[in-house]
Amino acid sequence: FIDLGLNVVEDNASKREWLGANNLICTLPSSEGKEHVSKIYFTSHMDTVVPGINVKPILKEDGYVYSDGTTVLGADDKAGIAALLEMIQTINEQELPHGQIQFIITVGEEAGLKGAKELDQNLIDAEFGYAVDASQAVGTTVVGAPTQMIINTTIYGKTAHASKPNQGISAIHIAAKAINKMHLGQIDQDTTANIGKFYGGSATNIVADKVILEGEARSHNDKSLEYQINHMKETFETTAKELGGKANVEISKIYPGFRRNDSETVTQYAIKSAKTLGLSGKTVIAGGGSDGSIINTYHIPTVILGVGYEHIHTTSERIPVAALNQLTSQLIKIVELVAK
């Protein structure tokens, strides 16, 4: 970004022990005569899921870029960054008129949007913007996402030798009973819930006195989400009490939901840029969060642009070169439309 002539500032996100680097805020000043147009931003994240070290990208005859199969490709979200860099290069080479553009390159997105949560808001100077980080096809815009809550539960029983089970209280038994009572899966059209991790115990000949369960619920409806989380919490607690044990339940919000209208300026530029290029221009509601979920809470309207990568978070991840070209063209078109 510095080599392309941008002013680059690092925030202090790495002060948090779970982040190994800072976020970058890179600013491309407006071209002459375009100081009055809306200031916008784009964001992509620089981290990937594991295994993501020593990635060896391979362009195959089908037009897709793959890894060698031993790592993820990391197109989520290196593809977003690549398209942003190519856009800047094109703007510079072709001297395209443009307003001020910021590029927010975050850390820790895959760890729970932690970089965006630690982002220094005082460094952001934009009226609206775009997260370049959706698995949808290029030309599709994500205009909404759910709120996600995590529910972590520790269940305590009483240890005993397995040959004398009546002298103990099995934490595993309590957990199994609670899960059996619990409403999980697709709760309603807006809400899902899941218990994803369950571990504990020390040996087959010991009644387990402690187990830990990690779960989540997410919803586009805050009331439905609150009801579901309370249902899960109360089910753990009442079941444990009925069977002589105890449940310690911890609940935390990972990211808030958001919903942007198709008529909003930020969405209109995404739709128009896509349709101008012959792309779908459709808008969708996503089932997961992104850095855009967090930046929307900073009162900066944000939607998420489809990047076109496929099979993310697996060693089969791939992206067509055509999608990268289309994405770059859409980013440039957004800048051009805003500058008119």
Located regions from the model:
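Acidic, glycine-rich active-site loops and adjacent beta-strand->loop/helix elements
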Residues: 14, 46-48, 104-112, 134-136, ...
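Acidic-glycine-rich active-site phosphate/pyrophosphate-binding loop
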Residues: 49-63, 141-154, 272, 303
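Glycine/charged-rich beta-loop-alpha catalytic/anionic-binding loops adjacent to active sites
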Residues: 59-72, 156-159, 277, 309-313
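Acidic/histidine-rich catalytic neighborhood of metal-dependent amide-processing enzymes
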Residues: 71-148, 193, 204-205, 213-216, ...
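A non-catalytic alpha/beta surface segment that caps or lines the substrate-entry region
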Residues: 1-35
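A short glycine/serine-rich beta->alpha loop
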Residues: 66-75, 159-163, 201, 319
